[in-house]
Design a protein with these regions (language model features):
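Short helix-loop "hinge" at the ATP-lid/N-box region of the Bergerat-fold HATPase_c
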Residues: 139-140
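Glycine-rich ATP-binding loops of the HATPase_c
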Residues: 212-220
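Conserved catalytic submotifs in the C-terminal HATPase_c
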Residues: 109-119
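Detector for a conserved hydrophobic position within an alpha-helical segment of the HATPase_c
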Residues: 208-209
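Short conserved segment of the HATPase_c
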Residues: 173-185
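Short alpha-helical Gxxx[C/S/T] motif in the catalytic ATP-binding
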Residues: 200, 204
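Short alpha-helical segment of the dimerization/phosphotransfer core of two-component systems
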Residues: 52-61
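Conserved micro-motifs of the catalytic ATP-binding
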Residues: 72-81, 120-123
Length: 239
């Protein structure tokens, strides 16, 4: 993939801004704690906020690393650890845990249905986790206050594909918008949150298609305000 130079610079500038802001917040919060400006009973709350900011920053940097790895001739192992077993409910729970605290601030929950069935595929759990983290991040950012993000997974009988469906009420997007495109953010989303890299969902598509040989899609129903993401991964089995 060869990107227009001006567009690349704009993307990197925006990305850098998204990384620096949380780190500045972390440094400011730590200074306030160390200087004794934060009451002792408020320190745990502030530390959880710091952890959330650091998790966001790490996720952004991982997205950039995946973007470089899967769109260039960057000399990296593109399919490392792909012989591992990805237990889908376990990876979903791990990914969701990063956004539970952030979601609570707006009354948004993440719930996995039917977690008892251990559907699985062969692949790298860390890479699949990043896909789910990006989608949960999107859901928490643009979800409606007090809504629930529901996650279901099952194995389709005729194809053997594992299907992961993530649904929740949220700010929508138009059908003509390719929200998985590089640097693309829905018009309605930009009205709610001005900042954003436009990289997370693009990385989801790169990983699902290029690493797992699967498919990812999304749709929004304006009448019900329901946004759904569907991930299809071949080679499903029950662990």
């Amino acid at each position: 993939m060869k990107l227009d130079e001006d567009y690349t610079l704009l993307l990197l500038s925006n990305f850098t801004h998204q990384v620096i802001n949380p780190l500045n917040g972390v440094m400011g919060s730590l200074d306030n704690i160390l200087d004794g400006h934060v009451p002792s009973d408020k320190v745990p709350i502030r530390l959880r906020g710091i952890r959330g900011q650091l998790e966001t920053t790490v996720s952004l940097i991982r997205n950039l690393a995946f973007f470089v790895q899967y769109t260039t001739n960057y000399p990296a192992e593109k399919h490392d650890k792909m012989d591992k077993v990805c237990v889908i409910p376990q990876v979903i729970i791990e990914a969701a845990s990063f956004y539970q605290e952030q979601g609570k601030q707006r009354g948004i929950g993440i719930e996995l249905r039917n977690r008892a069935v251990q559907n699985a595929i062969r692949g790298n759990p860390d890479i699949l986790r990043q896909v789910l983290m990006n989608i949960f991040d999107n859901g928490v950012k643009y979800g409606l206050d007090g809504s629930m993000i529901e996650v279901n997974d099952w194995i389709q009988k005729n194809s053997g594909d594992v299907i992961i469906k993530i649904s929740g009420e949220s700010i929508g997007f138009n059908p003509e918008e390719d929200i998985f495109g590089l640097g693309i953010r829905g018009k309605e989303a930009t009205k709610v949150l001005a900042s954003g890299t436009g990289l997370g969902l693009h990385v989801c598509r790169l990983i699902v298609e290029n690493v797992f040989g699967g498919k990812i899609s999304a749709q929004h129903v304006a009448r019900t305000k329901l946004t759904s993401f569907e991930i299809r991964l071949p080679g499903g089995f029950i662990q």
